[in-house]
Amino acid sequence: MITPGEYTLLLTDEVQRAIAANRGRDPLEVALDRNTPHARLVATQVKYLARAEAKLPSYAAAQCILPPLAFEQASSEACAAHKRIAGGAVLDLTCGLGADAFFLARRFRRVVTLERDQTLARIAAENFRRLGAANIEVVNTSAETYLAQPGLHFDWVYADPDRRSGDGRKLVRLEDCSPDILSLMPLIGRTSGRLCVKNSPLFDIGEALRLFPGARVEAVSLGDECKEVVIYADGTGPGITATALGRGSFTATPAQAGAPPHPGAFEPDRYRWLVVPDVALQKARLARLHLRGKADIWSENGYGFAAERPEGIIGRVFAIESIEPYDPRRLKRAFKGRGAELMKRDFPFAAEELARRLGVHAGNDVRLAFTKIGSGFWVVRLE
């Protein structure tokens, strides 16, 4: 975390010029450069501004101040921009670096965002100034203290609770995070009729619907990695959505999600296409429903198989060269020493263990997909 003294230094023209002059350099070289004032402080900013070019490009372009821990915990711009809420005024209970508040400010006329740490609150306010976000008010207080005030009214309350314990362990359960949203529900309920909560990508969709029965729950992925599970408790549900940013979304009710029948027996000779559902569909347990009528799939965590190339798929599609039972000895004879891309779903061995068993190394000579269907293990060679 940046100390109050370091924050004061970061505001000076001398340090700001040094940061600007050294962007693009190796941070280690900057830290050891005797000609750079406050070299270690400058090097840290150079390092995180470089990382922000991909994760938070607006922050990078404005040369915002980036505390390392707050940066690591911040939403990416792609995820922050996606939040499906809008209105007149929103209360953000968990400012942090402020990426979510910054993008909420584009959807709301007024944003009030809370930050318990005084220095981080000052940094967030300074960054909003640099970003030109004039409709955001940063309040240095806790969610518990602010919500205790009488007469509050907001169109939405937003929260991204801190999911790390005091000793650095990652937390998943909502009641273990800070602030404890569940214990604050009476105060939140009198402040707004709508609540949006960002959760860990490990958070269970079923648990979200149990805690908030009338909610919409969305699993969000970026680059085929599940980034967050978002609860929209506004009484418009229940509903489940899988969103792959840049690829598309698919929505169903909980009743629909549990409805798809399993295909019959696996007949490998029928199939010419392998479908890899996006991880958002897996997380939301909507893969089978999404592929219904387009591809056969036996498990929410498995692959889909199609005789004709399916269209409108949220995921990837590969042409199949062959499908055969998994026989590690035969595969080792065929591929030992070759470069291989190994994919797996619903398969008991990690990719590293498969590579060891088959005697292959990372490469693109061949692409193999491993899976389990029923009691059988299969390997799919892809074109």
Task: Describe the role of every protein-language-model region.
Residues 1-383:
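SAM-dependent transferase fold signal centered on methyltransferase-like domains
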